[in-house]
């Protein structure tokens, strides 16, 4: 597993997907240019099984905490400093199907030095059994994603959040249970009743 990795950074990719020839170069270039970087994610697209057709490009925004709490927009390609990995631990099988989302959330809890490379540096192979082509094939992954977000909230001290799946698979909504305490307003106006 991850404990066997000896490099300074670890890149996460699925075994059947494709990296363009410049993907790792661009990641190293970003790390050299911005030495405080602790995690990197890139833009991505989907690719046909024969590798001839590229489609559904996903041009991502720079790091956005609220968006990350709503969907795993990091997804592919994700590169993270080994020290961050050692701090947060590896992939948690409790979130099978969304263990990458849980991992990204845990990484984002220990570093804000997250960098977006605005280039398509990952080609997600779309086949009928993958969530790339058939999201309904792995509904358990979306349920695990909701649990991963709820666990993230608990770790950062937000106990009043309820996470639900939206109509769009892989997109979640957080409902915060807000108390309605009694509010008192004190207006210091002794001897100035006309001002009221």
Q: What is the predicted role of each segment?
A:
Residues 3, 47, 53-83, 87, ...:
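A recurrent flexible, glycine/aromatic-enriched loop bordering the glycosyltransferase active site
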Residues 10:
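Short aromatic/hydrophobic "clamp" motif used to bind/position activated sugar donors
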Residues 18, 22-54, 127:
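Conserved donor NDP-sugar-binding/catalytic core segment of glycosyltransferases
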Residues 39, 48, 79-80, 97-98, ...:
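Conserved active-site beta-strand element of glycosyltransferases/polysaccharide synthases
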Residues 93-95, 105-125, 129, 147-166:
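Catalytic donor-sugar/metal-binding loop of nucleotide-sugar-dependent glycosyltransferases
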Residues 123-147, 180:
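Nucleotide-sugar-dependent glycosyltransferase catalytic core
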Residues 150-195:
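N-proximal low-complexity "stem/linker" segments adjacent to membrane-targeting elements
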